[in-house]
Amino acid sequence: MGLAVRKSNVPALADEPIKIGSGGGFWGDRPLAPLDLLKSDDLDYLMIDYLAELTLSIMTKQKRRDPSSGWATDLELWLAAGGIHTLRKKSVKLVTNAGGANPESCARMVLEQANKIGWHECKVAVISGDDILPRLDYLLENGEEFAHFESGEKISENGAEMMSANAYLGAGPIASALEIGADIIITGRVADASLLVGCMLHSAGWAHNAFQLGLTRESPVADWAPENVRNPLDILAQWTVAGHLIECGAQVSGGNYSNWGDVPNLATLTLPIAEIYSDGVVKITRGQGGGGMVNRGIVAEQLIYEIGDPAAYITPDVVVDMRNITLEDESEDVVVVTGAIGKPEPESLKVSAAIEGGWFAASSLLVSGPDALGRATACDAALRGRLSALEELEIYTEFIGGGVSLPENIRQRVSSTLNPPEVLLRWAVSSTNKQDITDFSREVAPLVLTGPAGVGGYGARPKPRRQLQFWPSLISRKSIEPFVRVELLTHLRITQESERFHFIRKRTRNILSRLQDELDDREWTRPIVKKLGWESNDADAEVTNLQEKEVES
């Protein structure tokens, strides 16, 4: 697929950094925080990562129940609260994977919000192609195995139904959307750091250069670099590290920090900003006017978060070697990041999938007073004894307050000294048999009267719920990239003076005339006919249809 660019609209990088803010770290993060960051700081882009590993499987279930759902509804909350107006006023580009399992519906919501404030020229790009579930049988027939990362088991050997399957796309489609003038970009599953890398491919002129060279979106993005860029892989690595550092939102501006007592005013924690310079240098800072902090220790903790091998942090765009990264406190709330080394992009892309896993439920009781841990253990033994005939039922027990969060070797050493005043006894159960879960739910509350003394805190019987099991695997790039689509959605405004308006009016009247006799026989249809007829002296009419334009392939 070509990049389909007609002219360059690349911001000048020069000595001024590109400022990219993070609006949050997951679906469920503070919903209005992105608006606060937009108002307090001058950004070029706002990126928001809404998708955790299993979020898409949840969204897929929602979409099956309601074809218009399956996306991160928190996006609508802050857009409607003034976010769409602020994006327009400050000319900030929004790039987010809020589209989840249904990026088209999410994009239409965004367009509706823009239309409400009169932003009719707003261009919303939809990036799709990550959802491979509709093509699963074809992919299996053509050699894709979807072997589980940990067990190595092939999906065909498991036999369970795959409920969702999404490949992690890279930065190329995002850069393409920005090149054709998108104001807001809605994606499905895109690698977290690629949200930022796509912005930089556009702002640094790489995407425009790729168009000039006739490169396709499937070509390695390192090849998009202009001739004067001497170390494109290392630049990509720096951009990727920047995206990795801010994709978890406030986790790099003071949240979830080991030395939490040093962080001022957690109640008003501000979100992080990455400032990126033309030579690849990255500075991490934070929004103005609130609590939080950015220092070397905080950035270091986020740097090693979820990376696996620091010598090979794999993304669709580049493989990053982090071992030579240097972090320096430049000033208060500013950390300079340098030294990332890039290696060529991987041949495969990660797939986040979920398979049908039977049924599950969870419930808990509170045990308080002397020897709370001993009595909680007795409760657990009683429940297991009463359910021992259910051979397929798996029971997992946690004694919260009794050291359950400690590593096993430490818990064994301190278990004899633990004497918590209360313990939250929590069970999670699973089974392929729904009735097993129902039987479990009926045995929890009776322990208040039929177990040790001092047991309470029970609630309603938990209902059996369908269980999804995470299935991470790989897929070849050639099975994904040719199917990625970038579409541009805009509002179509029509007045009486336009030829399009006259065509629509004429076509509608012709249809109505053929149905006139039937419609007149039904009294309830007359107001509708009158409404659709359009009197010739009407004022300018506005039709807010959606016009879709697919990027040239």
Question: PLM features: residue spans?
Answer:
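Catalytic or ion-translocation cores adjacent to nucleophile or general acid/base/metal-coordination motifs
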Residues: 115-132, 197-264
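C-terminal non-catalytic interaction/assembly regions of soluble proteins
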Residues: 338-539, 543
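A conserved active-site cap/scaffold subdomain adjacent to cofactor or substrate pockets
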Residues: 234-334
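Active-site cavity-forming subdomains of large catalytic enzyme subunits
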Residues: 114-117, 122-187, 193
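Gly-rich Lys/Arg/Thr-decorated short loops/hinges at beta-loop-alpha junctions or inter-strand turns
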Residues: 12-16, 53-69, 88, 132-160
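N-terminal glycine-rich anion-binding loops that anchor highly charged ligand groups
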Residues: 41-59
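Flexible, glycine/charged-enriched surface loops at secondary-structure junctions
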Residues: 120-124, 252-267, 310-329, 385-401, ...
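N-terminal amphipathic/basic leader segments beginning at the initiator methionine
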Residues: 2-36
